[in-house]
Amino acid sequence: MDTKSLLVTGYRHTDLGIFSEKDPRLHIIKSAIRRNFIRFLEEGVSWFILTGQLGFEYWSLEVLEDLRAEGYQLSIATIFPFENHGEQWNEANQAKLARFKQVDFVKYAYPRYENPGQFRDYNQFLLDNTTGCYLFYDSENETNLKYLYHMVLKKEGYNRKTLTFEELNEEAENFSNSE
């Protein structure tokens, strides 16, 4: 993957029905994220760009923080869609939001929501300012992420690695076989 800056996004925790940090699926998801991130780092990725979403992005942030603590050289950015992103979240999620704000680079695309076109422009900005993406998404299980996903598919020369449910099933099999 000839990529230096990687957009990282995917399903939210609610899309996957994961509402507890103790959910056994998290270990498998984070294991797959870790394996892929190490490969990306070995291939020269230096910046990981997040948008501040709970679920896949937050778990990715946790893995990136662990990798950094282990000595991997990497930079993390969060580019929120709006300045008030997450302000209505509960206390536990506010703590997660705070972690997104403690990375190497933090910006907001817009001061506040005004119209739906902002999301299209925001997605385009993310694609224009990264050289690839790591996406946990399956077109068979659509969410609002489909808009970004279709933009990624249309962007020529844009590197894409998609984490699929099939890959997670393989990760689960490997995990259970190693115990």
From Swiss-Prot:
It comes from the Bacteria. InterPro entries: YspA. SUPFAM superfamilies: MCP/YpsA-like. Belongs to the UPF0398 family. HAMAP family: UPF0398. PANTHER family: UPF0398 PROTEIN SPR0331, UPF0398 PROTEIN YPSA. This is UPF0398 protein SSU05_0416.
